[in-house]
């Protein structure tokens, strides 16, 4: 979509989101929405998995209709769930932040598509700090430990290494 201008909003001041309360995550996400709407964004994609899991429904159902009804807001959960459900046969592991696991969004959405799937949600609180601290050896070890537990594994966290 080269005909569009893009704005990247990265909330580095409040990271990581995974250990925050749902109220904090919603507040941070609403702040981002207001900023992006003030910049005349017509489409906003919440690329943070935790913010999508915790705040997207509220934003789509309550905030946007009142505050900016012409704006479309999407997240990362539904596209991922659609692919995972198509590829999974019996059991899926969801490895994510504590806040994402608490939301049960992946379990709910996967069961809408395939109610027979067995889904295990696992919080990975050590993974984000390992990546943010550039400890890629530890991050790789943790990912392997989580992934080895499941035939189908969804790994959900989007931290960035810190300089």
Predicted features, each with a name:
Residues 31, 36-57:
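Beta-alpha junction/loop-to-helix N-cap segments that form part of ligand/metal-binding clefts
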Residues 1, 49-54, 97-102, 158:
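Gly/Ser/Thr-rich loops at beta-strand to alpha-helix junctions
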Residues 53-87:
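Glycine/small-residue-rich loop that forms an oxyanion/phosphate-binding "nest" at active or ligand-binding sites
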Residues 156-163:
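Conserved small/polar residues in nucleotide/adenosyl-binding loops
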Residues 27-37, 73-91, 100:
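Hydrophobic alpha-helical segments within soluble ligand-binding/sensing domains
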């Amino acid at each position: 979509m080269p005909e569009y201008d893009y704005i990247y909003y990265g909330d580095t001041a409040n990271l990581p989101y995974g250990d925050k309360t749902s109220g904090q995550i919603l507040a941070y996400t609403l702040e981002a929405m207001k900023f992006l709407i003030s910049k005349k964004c017509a489409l906003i994609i919440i690329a943070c998995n935790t913010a999508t899991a915790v705040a997207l429904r509220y934003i789509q159902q309550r905030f946007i209709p009142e505050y900016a009804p012409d704006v479309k807001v999407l997240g990362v959960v539904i596209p991922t769930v659609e692919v995972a459900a198509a590829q999974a046969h019996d059991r899926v592991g969801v490895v994510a932040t504590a806040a994402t696991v608490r939301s049960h969004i992946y379990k709910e959405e996967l069961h809408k598509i395939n109610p027979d799937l067995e889904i295990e949600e696992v919080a990975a609180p050590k993974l984000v700090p390992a990546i943010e601290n550039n400890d890629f050896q530890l991050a790789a070890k943790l990912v392997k430990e989580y992934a080895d537990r499941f035939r189908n594994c969804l790994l959900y966290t989007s931290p960035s290494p810190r300089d």
